């Protein structure tokens, strides 16, 4: 097997062309390609190009909406909700993070709730964006347990219910 080296721009272009060819609109493809490129740049190979086949599979199956429009609703001064319309979470977060940051700065604390989206990407880009705005952030998801295995992971001998 041979190794192919790609520049960060080539990674972005490859990801974007692939996503566009498989049902994403330009905005969605750009957001996801940026995420893929940055994960590769940061050395997180499990969240870079490695994720592209899963994105394509979800798009082809119709599970992931590559052209969906998110709906943002301000529930209260500190609670923002974004209806994801089956888009991938990074696309939904792109819509909600600016309003979340604004609410947190105005009120001292804020929560962003996302419904009907799919998450299979890195979670630190969102917290990094908020940290760059001088905020503290926590990111959580309800994705499958043990989504990323660790080298010395041991499983419990008893099931905890």
Q: Model-found features: residue ranges?
A:
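Short coil/turn connectors at secondary-structure junctions
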Residues: 76-79, 106-109, 132-136
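Glycine-rich anion/phosphate-binding loop at the beta-strand->alpha-helix junction
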Residues: 111-153
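Single conserved hydrophobic/aromatic residue that forms the stacking wall/gate
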Residues: 152-161
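Generic N-terminal amphipathic, Lys/Arg-enriched alpha-helix
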Residues: 1-22
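N-terminal and secondary-structure boundary signal
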Residues: 20-23, 42-46
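Alpha/propeptide regions of enzymes that mature by internal proteolysis
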Residues: 37, 90-115
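Short, well-structured alpha-helical segments
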Residues: 26-37
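Active-site cofactor/substrate anionic-group-binding motifs, chiefly glycine-
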Residues: 51-96
């Amino acid at each position: 097997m041979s190794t192919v080296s790609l520049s960060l721009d080539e990674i972005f272009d490859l990801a974007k062309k692939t996503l566009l060819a498989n049902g994403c609109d330009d905005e969605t493809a750009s957001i996801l390609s940026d995420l893929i490129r940055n994960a590769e740049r940061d050395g997180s190979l499990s969240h870079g190009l490695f994720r592209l086949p899963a994105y394509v599979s979800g798009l082809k199956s119709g599970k992931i909406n590559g052209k969906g429009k998110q709906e943002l609703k301000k529930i209260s001064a500190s609670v923002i909700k974004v209806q994801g319309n089956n888009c991938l979470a990074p696309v939904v977060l792109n819509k909600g993070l600016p309003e979340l940051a604004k609410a947190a700065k105005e009120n001292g604390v804020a929560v962003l709730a996302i419904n009907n989206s799919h998450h299979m990407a890195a979670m630190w880009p969102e917290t990094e964006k908020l940290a760059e705005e001088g905020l503290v952030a926590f990111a959580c998801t309800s994705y499958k347990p043990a989504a990323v295995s660790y080298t010395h992971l041991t499983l419990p001998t008893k099931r905890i219910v």
